[in-house]
Each structure stands twice: as C-alpha cells, then as structure tokens.
A protein has these predicted regions:
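Phosphate-rich cofactor/ligand-interacting catalytic cores and adjacent structured alpha/beta frameworks
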Residues: 1-138, 142, 161-174
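Conserved phosphate/anionic-ligand binding catalytic regions in large, soluble enzymes, centered on
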Residues: 143-158
C-alpha cells in the first residue's frame, strides 16, 4: 500500500506492515493436510506462511545483509544475487526441499551451502561462486531436489534491491 500511494517507507516499516496483515494466519500454521502444515507439525518448519508471519525475517536477517556484503566486495549485482541465493539455501528451512527429499535432504543442502559460504572466495570471486553453484545445482538435480522456497525469497530480495530507498541505501555501482 505504501508504494502504491508513493509514501516514503523503508524495509523495516514494510516488514512490520506484512507482520500486521498476516497476524491472523498464525493459528493456521500447523492445520490442514498440506505439505507445509505437515512439515510445521513434524519439524517446526514454518514455510511460506510462517515467513510472511515473521515479516520475511529471513530477508532481514540473512538475504539483505548477504547482498550488501557481496555487492560491496564486487560491485557485481549478478554475483551478489547468487551469493544471496546460496545464503538462503544455508538458512531457509525450504519445505520444497523437504517435500522432495525429506529433512535429511534439507540438512545436506544447508550443510553444502554453508561449506561453500565458508570459502572467502565465494563472496569476492564471481567465477568461484558460479562454479560452486553449478556443482551444487547438478547435485540437487541428481537428488531431485527443488529449492523453490529459497527461489521465492530470492525473487523478493531482487524486488527489494530495485527500490534502494526501501533499504536506505543504493546497491548500484558508483
């Protein structure tokens, strides 16, 4: 609403608005027979509804700081977004992954992503990160894993970085 009305806003205010709008969804988190509800009951994974309830805390806590770090290191938007995706894979409880491969697959994927992120070259060297992501993609394909939840969060991150006034900074090279 704030953007449609061309009101000044920032990400913390939008995140708070999202939390307020979604507050009524909390009782629904573990109800129903959807995969997301089942994974919430079994593993405490909040899925898309839980992410919205939190005002997209995964973006605030992980994706946006990762974008800032990688962009500052390289001034390369594509590289920064790849770094964000890897960061999301490491920290998001992606229920798409769990649906395809079980909680063990999520543990494996998060471990692989964290291993890649632990290499300093991942943040500073676009070629090294791209090669690591290609390898990880091939492994996920072999295991029939879909990282759709993390991809959705990446899409929201891309949208947010198109509106630097929302984040209080510009991410484009000077």
């Amino acid at each position: 609403r704030r953007i449609a009305r061309q009101e000044q806003s920032d990400w913390p205010a939008l995140s708070a608005d999202i939390r307020a709008i979604c507050a009524g969804l909390e009782p629904e988190l573990g109800q129903g027979n959807t995969a997301g509800a089942r994974f919430y009951r079994q593993h405490g994974l909040p899925g898309a509804r839980g992410e919205a309830l939190s005002g997209f805390a995964t973006l605030t806590d992980f994706a946006l700081p990762a974008y800032q770090q990688a962009f500052a290191a390289t001034a390369n938007r594509t590289h920064a977004l790849r770094y964000v995706f890897l960061t999301l894979l490491a920290h998001n409880g992606d229920t798409n992954v769990v649906k395809r491969g079980g909680i063990e697959a999520l543990d494996w994927l998060q471990g692989r992503a964290r291993h890649i992120l632990a290499d300093p070259a991942a943040r500073r060297q676009p070629e090294a990160l791209y090669a690591a992501l290609q390898t990880l993609d091939a492994q996920c394909t072999e295991k029939n894993l879909s990282t759709g939840g993390s991809a959705d969060l990446l899409a929201l991150t891309i949208w947010l970085t198109e509106y630097p006034n929302l984040l209080g900074t510009s991410y484009e090279p000077t």
